[in-house]
Amino acid sequence: MSVSSIADKIVSESILIVDFGSQVTQLIARRVREAGVYSEIVPFNRAEEAFQRLQPKGIILSGSPASVVAEGSPRAPESFFQAGIPIFGICYGQQVMCHQLGGKVTANDVDGEFGRAFIDVIAPSPLFENLWKVGEKHQVWMSHADRVEALPEGFKPIAVSDGAPFALIADEKRRFYGMQFHPEVVHTPDGGKLIAHFVHDICGLAGDWTMAEFRQTKIAEIRKQVGDGRVICGLSGGVDSSVTAVLVHEAIGDQLTCVFVDHGLMRQGEAEQVVSLFREHYGIKLVHVNAEDRFLAGLKGVTDPETKRKFIGKTFIEIFEEEAKKIGGADFLAQGTLYPDVIESVSFLGGPSVTIKSHHNVGGLPERMNMKLVEPLRELFKDEVRDLGRELGMPDVFVDRHPFPGPGLAIRIPGEVTKERCDILRKADAVYLEEIRNAGLYNAIWQAFAVLLPVRTVGVMGDGRTYDSVCALRAVTSTDGMTAEIYPFQPEFLANVATRIVNEVRGINRVTYDFTSKPPGTIEWE
């Protein structure tokens, strides 16, 4: 199959997800992708345009904080119901479908269903063939006040709950399905399978969307967009920019130049790893700027976390712009923008409006230098970027790397940042991560790091008194970084790490562990 044919195949074998403003719409896309089918999320007021572009094989209508019976609440394009393709309505999506097709929805401010609920399957359906059987009871997750009171013509109930007589409905002839619960959340145990049944059995999609196909498609798109032009890419050493650089280089070779601004605030050995991988292993043209002195000079005397962040971000952009001008002739800027950065969100306060989340890793640089953006990862979620990195043959040490903040160690050193304190923290952090890897725990943890506190305590080493710094250890589990739980290390593990740090890292004589979840705390200390 040719590259252009692969691109056409991905677009034609897709699911369109219409967003009515639900907080969990992204999870719908995740479940469809997990079923091996490409999906796109669009706000309801741009859905018709997206439908014409994608020509999807099925439509999913999301939930919403709005009420179908409220004046001005969002609607699906009427043309969707005449298109002859399957539709899957979730919560508000079910209600709006029923309302637009002649059913009745009532507002309910008293006794809605919220949280775990159970549905009883009362009729068979191709939607859950070989998954659920008539007479069975299944756990789902509800979050609704309004509910459907009367079904449109052609629909019948196929599952009920205590608070929803039409918990799951079907018009099998038109292949329209609606459910009052949320199959996209993990609290509906069979929800992912239900969505997979919809895209495979109802929409007839094979589920063969793979990273290998995505890779070839993106290579073709990059070559078409860039032509004979030149591209620069800012490398941070993180997963997103690294995968972007390798993919773009595979597409256009020496037309790409990467700029790696080393601010002296990276983890131990990280700068050397970046240079080695990209310059020596991949043969990518790389400009390595050692700007440690410039950053540390600007941070002298600075203790406020926000001031640190702003200075580091501003200085990074200045240096990147200086280097880009030295390179000269660049027509494009490659960025590691991801799908959550560009999904359009919908607000209903004061009427429907669309806010597009912007994501510029180098601020306004593209506009100031008259460059066009190349964003090959903009359709991917974070874990899919890691999958693409593996598909590209990148080393696990880069692909599976824990998130690392742009300001680096500066926000893991509360108080003034100095070279001496950076060096102390680097060593402690390296010991901690080494022990985590040795225990086989690295990939079970979302993020782990050490923090060097601006606190000194008395200790005893040998026969002498010490008065040195305190190191705090942090490790959390998370799926998206929005919320996080502490990682439950065994006490023996933490005791071993603490012993190694105080013995091997001069300048630290006490180690603590941070037991704070997010919320109320943040993952980073500053």
Curated annotation (Swiss-Prot):
InterPro entries: Class_I_gatase-like (IPR029062), GATASE (IPR017926), GMP_synth_C (IPR001674), GMP_synth_GATase (IPR004739), GMP_synthase (IPR022955), GMPS_ATP_PPase_dom (IPR025777), NAD/GMP_synthase (IPR022310), Rossmann-like_a/b/a_fold (IPR014729)
Keyword ATP-binding: yes
Highest rank taxon of the organism: Bacteria
Xref: Gene3D superfamilies: 3.30.300.10, 3.40.50.880, HUPs (3.40.50.620)
Catalytic activity entry: XMP + L-glutamine + ATP + H2O = GMP + L-glutamate + AMP + diphosphate + 2 H(+)
EC number: 6.3.5.2
Residue intervals of the Glutamine amidotransferase type-1 domain: 14-208
Enzyme class: ligase
Active site: 91, 182, 184
Function: Catalyzes the synthesis of GMP from XMP.
Protein name: GMP synthase [glutamine-hydrolyzing]
Organism of derivation: Zymomonas mobilis subsp. mobilis (strain ATCC 31821 / ZM4 / CP4)
Lineage of origin: Bacteria, Pseudomonadati, Pseudomonadota, Alphaproteobacteria, Sphingomonadales
Gene: guaA
